[in-house]
Amino acid sequence: MHRIRTIDSDFGKKRQKKMDNHISSMIYEIKFHEFVLFILEKKMGATRRTFLTDLARKKGFRVENELSNSVTHIVAENNSGSDVLAWLKTHKMEKTTQFELLDISWLIECMKVGKPVDTKGKYQLMESRVDSANPDPTAGTLNILPPTTKTISQYACQRRTTINNHNQRFTDAFEILAKNYEFKENDDTCLTFMRAISVLKCLPFEVVSLKDTEGLPWIGDEVKGIMEEIIEDGESLEVQAVLNDERYQSFKLFTSVFGVGLKTADKWYRMGFRTLNKIRSDKTLKLTKMQKAGLCYYEDLIDCVSKAEADAVSLLVQDAVWTFLPDALVTITGGFRRGKEFGHDVDFLITSPGAEKEQEDQLLQKVTNLWKKQGLLLYCDLIESTFEDLKLPSRKIDALDHFQKCFLILKLYHHKEDKRKWEMPTGSNESEAKSWKAIRVDLVVCPYDRYAFALLGWSGSRQFERDLRRYATHEKKMMLDNHALYDKTKKIFLKAKSEEEIFAHLGLEYIQPSERNA
């Protein structure tokens, strides 16, 4: 492998030049010769650029301090394709150069996995190439072509949405407003903001002006007004008013309790409750078994579940299920399947290619009984299956499925290597130390021939699934839910052994779970 000594460059700032000189004195080993990077300082800042440059070089990338003819990839942060294009047009080049323009998320992902990842698709800001009418590499001109602008679909199932959200300042604000309208049971306005959130999350750039939203679906006047306020003032008065609203605060607190929905939250609010301590201390209040468990383990349950904790729960679930059905498929679904690092619970889909119906029906009861004997079961609500083989998919977009399922709270013990996080306070007894955490777990059992449909439905996101069903209905005259896909024109059920086959039936390009974070 070759080694490279970086070249000094004057960026016009003494401090930056000093930092670059420090970097230039280091020697790094180049592992990936087909990549020559230039990191754009625009909107990033000199300090962060220097840090990322040094980090990329340590990982084996060749990074140029100046834009030169040898550069193959330009990496930018918080810039749209038009921003980078404008910057490039003002930059003088000695000869025609061919390169790709990439978002900084590409470089960060490369450094995570320790090697270059595919540059196509979600990481591209724009495409550039030599003008075919002027192929002479010595012609002395740079021909930059704007990106291929594809119309962003109104359907989330036709958009690729990773966990890399470039517009979080807007989506965070809209999530607050959407939640407030949900609390008011104003479903239409809630959906307005949820759709706007979904569109903004799929964008590979940060919206810096309302011009960037031209042509985008579901970005109406109400949404634009709030975005304009955030762009100009850094915040929205409407959002701040919601955050300060007593009803919103109370509903948000009450619905954070496992087992509490909008009706219960409204009842408690009307009864004058504002804190959970008041609810706990009121002996006249009748609570369900689920609500009692939610209050009992509240502190644990509102604490996010990490990917490491989800993996530990996966082992627990697999061991228990395989005790009774050795050939069972146990698949983690929900946000963790979509690549999220944190969640509020852990969902699993279970099926078995060789199990009899009686074995499937008895599985969850056997598994929960085992955990009860092991002292791991803190709460269990088992819902029996009402699934019917020939029943048409539901017409309701948000309909729940009819598979057997159980909603659990499990006791997850922490490993010894994690004991520093859970060590006892000075002077406490060992018996007082809490060595476990209460975790919310959902288990769903489905017949093997419905596994693909159930997996697609339980993987989410909610908006992705809503739009997938809406697309099937309005564009394909089909009905889709967690159980089946039905063609209303041909009057037949369409079978599928995989998610890919379901997408194919719908005439859609397959979208990986990691790109369904709509």
Swiss-Prot record:
Residue interval(s) of motif Nuclear localization signal: 11-17
Disulfide bonds, paired cysteine numbers: none
Subcellular location: Nucleus
Listed GO MF terms: DNA binding; DNA nucleotidylexotransferase activity; DNA-directed DNA polymerase activity; metal ion binding
SMART domains given in the database record: BRCT (SM00292), POLXc (SM00483)
Pfam families: BRCT (PF00533), DNA_pol_B_palm (PF14792), DNA_pol_B_thumb (PF14791), DNA_pol_lambd_f (PF10391), HHH_8 (PF14716)
Sequence similarity: Belongs to the DNA polymerase type-X family.
Biological process per Gene Ontology, one example term: DNA metabolic process
Native source species: Monodelphis domestica (Gray short-tailed opossum)
Signal peptide: none
Listed cofactors: Mg(2+)
Main location, first listed in the record: nucleus
Ranges where the BRCT domain occurs: 27-124
GO cellular component: nucleus
Cofactor binding note: Can also utilize other divalent cations, such as Mn(2+) and Co(2+) (in vitro).
Residues involved in Mg(2+) binding: 345, 347, 442
Keyword Cytoplasm: no
Assembly description: Interacts with PRP19 and DNTTIP1. Interacts with TRERF1. Forms a ternary complex with DNTTIP2 and core histone. Released from this complex by PCNA.
Record's keyword annotation contains Nucleotidyltransferase: yes
Protein name as catalogued: DNA nucleotidylexotransferase
InterPro entries associated with the record: BRCT_dom, BRCT_dom_sf, DNA-dir_DNA_pol_X, DNA_pol-X_BS, DNA_pol_b-like_N, DNA_pol_B_palm_palm, DNA_pol_lambd_fingers_domain, DNA_pol_lamdba_lyase_dom_sf
